[in-house]
Amino acid sequence: MLGKGVVGGGGGTKAPKPSFVSYVRPEEIHTNEKEVTEKEVTLHLLPGEQLLCEASTVLKYVQEDSCQHGVYGRLVCTDFKIAFLGDDESALDNDETQFKNKVIGENDITLHCVDQIYGVFDEKKKTLFGQLKKYPEKLIIHCKDLRVFQFCLRYTKEEEVKRIVSGIIHHTQAPKLLKRLFLFSYATAAQNNTVTDPKNHTVMFDTLKDWCWELERTKGNMKYKAVSVNEGYKVCERLPAYFVVPTPLPEENVQRFQGHGIPIWCWSCHNGSALLKMSALPKEQDDGILQIQKSFLDGIYKTIHRPPYEIVKTEDLSSNFLSLQEIQTAYSKFKQLFLIDNSTEFWDTDIKWFSLLESSSWLDIIRRCLKKAIEITECMEAQNMNVLLLEENASDLCCLISSLVQLMMDPHCRTRIGFQSLIQKEWVMGGHCFLDRCNHLRQNDKEEVPVFLLFLDCVWQLVHQHPPAFEFTETYLTVLSDSLYIPIFSTFFFNSPHQKDTNMGREGQDTQSKPLNLLTVWDWSVQFEPKAQTLLKNPLYVEKPKLDKGQRKGMRFKHQRQLSLPLTQSKSSPKRGFFREETDHLIKNLLGKRISKLINSSDELQDNFREFYDSWHSKSTDYHGLLLPHIEGPEIKVWAQRYLRWIPEAQILGGGQVATLSKLLEMMEEVQSLQEKIDERHHSQQAPQAEAPCLLRNSARLSSLFPFALLQRHSSKPVLPTSGWKALGDEDDLAKREDEFVDLGDV
């Protein structure tokens, strides 16, 4: 059969030249099987999706040793995706495709997910862009989700090659208008078919009621108020229609500089301290205007800094922290470690893996973000300080750090609904420019910075270190990162709520028609069946038990901070910067005054951070209280499931965390069955139990990169780099050489 073939020309070590020469072109053989093939292969189109161009007799390579095996089929390009329709797709094992995305298939690439396109001309790899004078014999597509697709066009008709290559380059790289995104085509065509999930209780923060609810939940309504001064975006297009500011702040101050220079509330701690953010005022040269701005900021500052009762610490993220350029440069280097064209290239880079990883600085950037979040947590939790985050537009690093702080301090944010609501509040309503940062329109490459991916990587570090504390899994985080590039959801395709609201109208003469109903990414039923969604929920997570009124009354005298941050009892006197359970207001006031003088002392802050960090990690973890990550060198790891999932050689068959989780689920099922028998004996009502995902029950067949890596598809045979096998000597000598004794010591 021609469904699978082998061709030469692999990268790296060259394979021996085959002696057999075929004089029959593949398209001639396909002519005899054309009717059968057309019945087996079907292009599935979404509502509003249109086919633009296609090419037949395309060979899709898979990553394999020195030879390159592949599958023949059709390569098509629509206004939504690039898709490969293989001739033997029906041969896939159903067990391997249970975690299947209903929107994007295994061989589908959304146009927004394409990162770089390369062509191979006479075994030379070149970047493709613009109009081509010569068309390649091989097409390589690097995706933003780190997949690598290789297509051989050697047996495709010349006209089809020109059409498909030109079409893919144009529709993935040419600048677009916002209204020309597939998002609007889909919403228009599927307007009557979009059904929202009734179980989705994510707070969208698009109403005043949502903000009031959040204030009440965090007990922040004593000092802060929700305002509607920007309703209809009359004051500022950058801000949401509703947000929260300090109660003493007059609403006319919000209008004075179009929302700039205003402390906007993010979250309140149980001890009364709060996390706020502020965008910078416009830069002015005129001394008179500068003086007006200074007096304005002095007045604003007094609303949140009223010593000794309230002390504020400012964190200027624009000048004293990471730059967006650093993040982009680091990620550009980092992602190259995983965009592997073939197995030989993988093993070549394996020798220098650690040096390449270190030189990218990506893990160091993650560490710095987590450390900054811990520092702010220490100020709020231990020193009762308000913290004000400063940034030029308060829409990048402010979103990142404020979200991490809330994840560490608020257990509600570690539930799935709480986490989704957090992203809605801090990122979507916070004005993070997803459209520019993801470069969805391809208008300005310099604006593309993976700030949200950095946030998800930081969250993964917390999930990896403290799995029982989170209701969601790393698989949830991985599919969330993939959803950045699926243009049927509005969540990650606008720069601000104003931009979304002003573009929700239908195009056409009928101006009285209803606005478009855009889907939200939080409706996971659009992408996954219920069975697949079980992998997004952590079976080891246990909700915090609710106390009855009698228990709450008995515990009311204790300070809430003690429940989340156990402190060393042997220390008789409190260290500087740590408030204990003193009730004497005078002592607290004096401590407040002393700390306010030391705000700018970096040594003192570093000492406070180290004591706070060490003290927390020396105690047992309360998964429903304060949660701090380890940030030492070895503790910050590579998010293997996201970055290595498409590399067959990186899999551990029947091993990794998925094997451990499978065993734990077996134990949970056994405990649940015993509990059911006990309940039956006592004739009590059986409580609904969470069913263990059947996908995890046979761990021996699973990969460490489950559920993304498919097993028994590729060879995982190591390939020694050229430099390695040459150093070992002649092949005959290797066969005769006896095994050397290696002392492993205590290993």
From Swiss-Prot:
Gene3D superfamilies reported in the protein's UniProt record: Pleckstrin-homology domain (PH domain)/Phosphotyrosine-binding domain (PTB)
The protein's GO terms of the molecular function aspect are: phosphatidylinositol-3-phosphate phosphatase activity
Tissue expression as described in the entry: Expressed in skeletal muscles (at protein level). Ubiquitous with prominent expression in brain, heart, kidney, placenta, and lung.
Query: In which compartments does the protein localize?
Result: Cytoplasm; Sarcoplasmic reticulum; Cytoplasm, Myofibril, Sarcomere
Gene Ontology terms: biological process = phosphatidylinositol dephosphorylation
Q: Where mainly located?
A: cytoplasm
| Keyword field contains Phosphoprotein | yes
InterPro entries listed in its UniProt record: MTMR12-like_C, MTMR12_PTP, Myotubularin, Myotubularin-like_Pase_dom, PH-like_dom_sf, Prot-tyrosine_phosphatase-like
Instruction: Output the Gene Ontology cellular-component terms.
Output: cytoplasm; cytosol; membrane; sarcomere; sarcoplasmic reticulum
Keyword list, A-Z: Cytoplasm, Phosphoprotein, Sarcoplasmic reticulum
Q: Modified residue Phosphoserine is at which positions?
A: S564, S601, S716
Phosphoprotein: is it a keyword of this entry?
A: yes
Source organism superkingdom: Eukaryota
Which region ranges are annotated with the description Interaction with MTM1?
449-558
- Name one matching Pfam family: 3-PAP
Myotubularin phosphatase domain residues:
205-643
Quaternary form? Heterodimer with lipid phosphatase MTM1. Heterodimer with lipid phosphatase MTMR2.
Q: Which family does it belong to?
A: Belongs to the protein-tyrosine phosphatase family. Non-receptor class myotubularin subfamily.
Chain's role: Acts as an adapter for the myotubularin-related phosphatases. Regulates phosphatase MTM1 protein stability and possibly its intracellular location. By stabilizing MTM1 protein levels, required for skeletal muscle maintenance but not for myogenesis.
Q: What is this protein called?
A: Myotubularin-related protein 12
Q: Which organism is it from?
A: Homo sapiens (Human)
Q: Recall the taxonomic lineage recorded for the source organism.
A: Eukaryota, Metazoa, Chordata, Craniata, Vertebrata
Q: Which gene encodes it?
A: MTMR12
